[in-house]
Design a protein with these regions (language model features):
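Active-site-proximal, glycine-rich beta->alpha crossover segments in alpha/beta enzymes
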Residues: 2, 83-153
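N-terminal basic, low-complexity leaders that serve as flexible interaction/assembly modules and, when applicable
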Residues: 2-86
């Protein structure tokens, strides 16, 4: 139910939104052209993330570098299945690892010493060492859960 100026409107059933390749923001082709990076490999290594972040900063005329390039990093570190995408559509959920809310309690703690999360943290550190200001986007609990389990559960 949604309240609008004193009126109640029934919104009906919740509709599933099928997130597809066409729905992804990704990284614009003018950013990736000429960099010699291969995707999705570029989303998984410190040095390529540093390069991408700096080029995005330059192209956007921003004052900060941003990491990571998706909202799946934390869920992946907990065992989430991630589709790393390509140069057009970045990393996104690839499937659910939980089919019941109780299964969430059995997921491992995040391990910051391996995988893409470690590489992203190293990229952040390297950017800072190079004098860059970095915004590190941290996913919240609902975003993380959305990668791990279908919201219907």
């Amino acid at each position: 139910m949604v309240m609008r100026r004193g009126n109640v409107k029934n919104m009906g059933d919740i509709k599933d939104f099928n997130c597809t390749y066409d729905n992804s923001a990704g990284i614009r082709s003018e950013v990736t052209e000429g960099l010699g990076l291969t995707f999705p490999d570029a989303y998984t290594h410190c040095d390529t993330m540093v390069t991408l972040s700096k080029v995005l900063k330059e192209k956007d005329k921003a004052v900060i570098c941003e990491l990571p390039f998706c909202h799946t990093l934390e869920a992946e570190a907990m065992g989430g299945i991630i589709n790393l995408g390509n140069e057009i559509a970045g990393p996104r959920a690839g499937g659910y690892v939980c089919t019941d809310v109780e299964e969430i309690l059995n997921l491992p703690d995040m391990d910051f010493t391996k995988g893409r999360i470690q590489e992203t943290l190293l990229a952040c550190k390297k950017l800072r060492e190079e004098g860059e200001h970095v915004v590190f986007e941290v996913a919240g609990p609902f975003t993380i859960l959305n990668v791990l389990i279908d919201a219907r559960y």
